[in-house]
Regions:
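SAM-dependent Rossmann-like transferase core, predominantly class I methyltransferases
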Residues: 69-141
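S-adenosylmethionine
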Residues: 174-285
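Nucleotide donor/acceptor-binding cores
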Residues: 108, 143-145, 241
């Protein structure tokens, strides 16, 4: 086993995620008390890693023998750092969460272990949605906005939104297993008293007027999104409300954006992470 390592500026994290999308064993992690991030890419052979070294510098070396099963266990998996607001751990132990809270004072620490539902935070679609959610929440007064997470999976986006200042929120998923997993995650983390969770179909459910969202997240398949834009539009509280959509393969991005445009949305931001695209949309004025 070989590893290539390089320190990068935090503001370049997204472009490095895209650059390293072909490497299944690529990890970007924050170091305690450091302003820069550490990129590590592992491979059985040095060839591709030496190519990275040739292009970008850093360090390439063989890895000492160790128990890789233990090394990749949840308690040894680096937490996901989202902006300066969120820390998401795959570990469910109270001791680990307390340790992370001490290591990252002032940040919101959440526990989302891998289960049968999608969305622990590490997938490019979920992590990009989380970054956009953090950015949008900063613009809104705490306790003065509402959130909807359509196709919530584990519930990570909805709970993050509540912790970031939403007054109330709604999470729903078509998959009953996802709803079960999300319920466990909300109970473990707390802070979801004003977050309503239930099973529903994006093509059938509609919010009451007082439930409509200022931030609406929909991390769904692009084919579902293209059909769901009219329903999603009806979930927005006001023309300035933001719709964040993901789950879009890069080759399906243009047709998905065209569908959004047909239903009155304009593109505010687009982020590509590997083969996945996330978009921030708003109703055209």
């Amino acid at each position: 086993m070989w590893v290539w390592k390089k320190h990068i500026a935090a503001e370049h994290e997204e472009e490095w995620q895209e650059r390293l999308a072909e490497f299944p064993w690529a990890v970007i992690s924050a170091l305690p008390h450091a302003k820069r991030l550490l990129v590590e890419v592992y491979d059985e052979a040095p060839g591709k890693l030496l190519a990275l070294y040739s292009c970008y510098g850093g360090d390439c070396s063989p890895v000492e023998e160790k128990d890789w099963v233990a090394a990749t266990a949840p308690e040894n998996t680096p937490p996901l750092i989202i902006r300066d607001r969120l820390v998401i751990s795959a570990d469910a132990s109270e001791a680990k969460i307390n340790e992370l809270q001490a290591r990252y004072p002032g940040r919101i620490v959440l526990s989302f272990p891998a289960e049968r539902a999608f969305g622990t935070g590490n997938h490019a679609t979920t992590s990009t949605c989380l970054r956009m959610l953090c950015d949008e929440a900063k613009k809104l007064a705490p306790g003065q906005w509402r959130l909807i997470d359509a196709g919530c999976g584990t519930g990570v986006l909805g709970l993050a939104g509540m912790r970031l200042g939403a007054q109330s929120g709604i999470c729903y998923d078509f998959d009953p297993i996802a709803v079960e997993v999300a319920e466990r995650n909300l109970q473990r983390n707390g802070g979801a008293e004003n977050l309503r969770l239930f099973q529903a179909d994006v093509f059938e459910w509609s919010p009451k007027p007082e439930e409509k969202a200022h931030i609406l997240l929909a991390n769904l398949f692009s084919t579902v999104l293209q059909r769901a834009f009219p329903r999603l539009k009806a979930c927005l509280a006001e023309p300035e409300s933001v719709l964040i959509v993901s789950g879009i393969l890069r080759e399906q991005a243009e047709e998905t954006l065209a569908a959004a445009n047909r239903h009155g949305f304009e593109l505010l931001r687009r982020v590509t992470a590997g083969k996945w695209v996330t978009m921030k949309l708003r109703q055209r004025s």
